[in-house]
């Protein structure tokens, strides 16, 4: 039987964040709604976003990096040539509040590494790690999801195009 001493020893060797703890305490609050498209930062939950976004294009016009495109009358985020700096200009101009400055400034995109990655080929390449402004990529290419905001700096920096954002 596990007693208090066991848990104290366990916790002295393992860090548990508040988010991680609450994820297990309140599992029913976890959203089961999956994204169907990559959305701009500061977007509402996918079900609300899909219902509220009217495809007006104000966010696309406001994006200084030209990363927001309209697909099927909905705003999508396309990080191909520049990262998202999470400036919030898209959220400031959204007339329907599908994007709003009070929503999380996270694109919810996370890097995926292909076999072309030099680190996976046992070569030295710290480019994605050093490019990440939040230091969310470890030397073993593990992503710290609590730090990562999906900006795409890692993808843009990768000169072998081994990173996709999903």
Curated annotation (Swiss-Prot):
All residue ranges annotated as the 4Fe-4S ferredoxin-type domain in the record: 44-73, 75-104, 139-166
Domain of life of the native organism: Bacteria
GO CC field: cytoplasm
Key word Cell inner membrane present: no
Binding site for [4Fe-4S] cluster 1: 53, 56, 59, 94
Alphabetical UniProt keywords: 4Fe-4S, Iron, Iron-sulfur, Metal-binding, Repeat
Amino-acid positions noted as binding [4Fe-4S] cluster 2 in the UniProt annotation, renumbered to this chain: 63, 84, 87, 90
The protein's name: Uncharacterized protein HI_1043
Organism: Haemophilus influenzae (strain ATCC 51907 / DSM 11121 / KW20 / Rd)
């Amino acid at each position: 039987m596990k007693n208090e001493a066991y848990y104290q020893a366990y916790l002295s060797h393992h860090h548990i964040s508040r988010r991680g703890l609450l994820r297990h305490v309140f599992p029913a609050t976890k959203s089961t709604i999956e994204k169907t498209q990559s959305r701009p930062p500061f977007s509402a939950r996918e079900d609300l976003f899909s219902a509220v976004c009217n495809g007006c294009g104000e966010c696309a016009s406001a994006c200084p990096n030209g990363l927001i495109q309209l697909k099927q009358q909905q705003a999508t985020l396309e990080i191909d040539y520049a990262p998202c700096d999470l400036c919030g200009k898209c959220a400031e101009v959204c007339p329907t509040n599908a994007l709003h400055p009070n929503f999380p400034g996270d694109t919810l995109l996370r890097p995926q590494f292909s076999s072309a990655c030099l680190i996976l080929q046992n070569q030295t390449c710290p480019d994605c790690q050093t490019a990440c402004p939040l230091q969310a990529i470890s030397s073993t290419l593990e992503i710290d999801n609590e730090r990562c905001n999906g900006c795409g700096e890692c993808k843009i920096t990768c000169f072998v195009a081994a990173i996709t954002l999903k």
